[in-house]
């Protein structure tokens, strides 16, 4: 008998940085991947050439979220996992309407995973005990709060809470966990002074890079028992 085709892993926001690194990690393991992207970065062409299914999506509206869900439903009969990596970063600053800031943060970090988890639930079920996963990417600020990014922190805290609710709803077929990172990697334009200030915020004083996230994702995917948990990835920052 031929080998059964693996079910794809869905990664939202997979066109750059951590999402892109995760996509390549799974592709290199011969694991089918579906990636959402909003902006067509050159890296998307590389993913497509490597066999990934890349779907352009606009998560700024609920209609856009559901249109993306419909495309996923048309493309596969099942999913191995959903990794909710799509994110946005908006601060409260002069001239930015506060209602717009809050609505934007809640839309991408709460409405989008909430709607996708419900819409794609049937693709995750029916594959066996603890055979599927949902992983939410939250943030270190869920624990600490943020005076400069209040809406962002609140939206990530809501996503953290949804982790436990969906874990209760979908067990034992689907494990639902979250990863709460702080600094993982710098942007290219970050200057030396900023980098040193950021590094000093954690005990480990390093930006570990995408591999640290990949290893933790692999751990959650291979576990048959861990669910409803938030795993911090902060280098001991909470002890500073």
Curated annotation (Swiss-Prot):
<comment type="similarity">
    <text>Belongs to the short-chain dehydrogenases/reductases (SDR) family. FolM subfamily.</text>
</comment>
<dbReference type="InterPro" id="IPR036291">
    <property type="entry name" value="NAD(P)-bd_dom_sf"/>
</dbReference>
<dbReference type="Pfam" id="PF13561">
    <property type="entry name" value="adh_short_C2"/>
</dbReference>
<dbReference type="GO" id="GO:0004146">
    <property type="term" value="F:dihydrofolate reductase activity"/>
</dbReference>
<dbReference type="GO" id="GO:0006730">
    <property type="term" value="P:one-carbon metabolic process"/>
</dbReference>
<comment type="function">
    <text>Catalyzes the reduction of dihydromonapterin to tetrahydromonapterin. Also has lower activity with dihydrofolate.</text>
</comment>
<feature type="active site" description="Proton acceptor">
    <location>
        <position position="152"/>
    </location>
</feature>
<keyword id="KW-0521">NADP</keyword>
<dbReference type="InterPro" id="IPR002347">
    <property type="entry name" value="SDR_fam"/>
</dbReference>
<dbReference type="InterPro" id="IPR020904">
    <property type="entry name" value="Sc_DH/Rdtase_CS"/>
</dbReference>
<keyword id="KW-0560">Oxidoreductase</keyword>
<protein>
    <recommendedName>
        <fullName>Dihydromonapterin reductase</fullName>
        <ecNumber>1.5.1.50</ecNumber>
        <ecNumber>1.5.1.3</ecNumber>
    </recommendedName>
</protein>
<keyword id="KW-0554">One-carbon metabolism</keyword>
């Amino acid at each position: 008998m031929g080998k059964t085709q693996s079910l794809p892993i869905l990664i939202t926001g997979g066109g750059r940085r951590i999402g892109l690194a995760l996509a390549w990690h799974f592709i290199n393991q011969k694991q089918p991947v579906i990636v959402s992207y909003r902006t067509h970065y050159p890296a998307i062409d590389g993913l497509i050439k490597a066999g990934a299914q890349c779907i352009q999506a606009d998560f700024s509206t609920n209609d856009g979220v559901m249109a993306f869900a419909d495309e996923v439903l048309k493309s596969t009969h099942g999913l191995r996992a959903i990794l909710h990596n799509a994110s946005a970063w908006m601060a409260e600053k002069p001239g930015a309407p506060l209602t717009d800031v809050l609505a934007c943060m809640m839309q991408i970090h709460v409405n989008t995973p909430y709607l996708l988890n419900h819409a794609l639930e049937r693709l995750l079920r029916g594959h066996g005990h603890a055979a599927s996963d949902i992983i939410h990417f939250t943030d270190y600020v869920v624990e600490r709060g943020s005076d400069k990014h209040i809406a962002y922190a609140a939206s990530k805290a809501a996503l953290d809470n949804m982790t436990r609710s969906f874990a209760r709803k979908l067990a034992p077929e689907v494990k639902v966990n979250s990863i709460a990172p702080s600094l993982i990697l710098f942007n290219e334009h970050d200057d030396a002074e900023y980098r040193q200030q950021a590094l000093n915020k954690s005990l480990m004083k390093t930006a570990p890079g995408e591999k640290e996230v990949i290893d933790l994702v692999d751990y959650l995917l291979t576990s048959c028992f861990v669910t409803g948990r938030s795993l911090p990835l902060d280098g001991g920052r909470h002890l500073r």
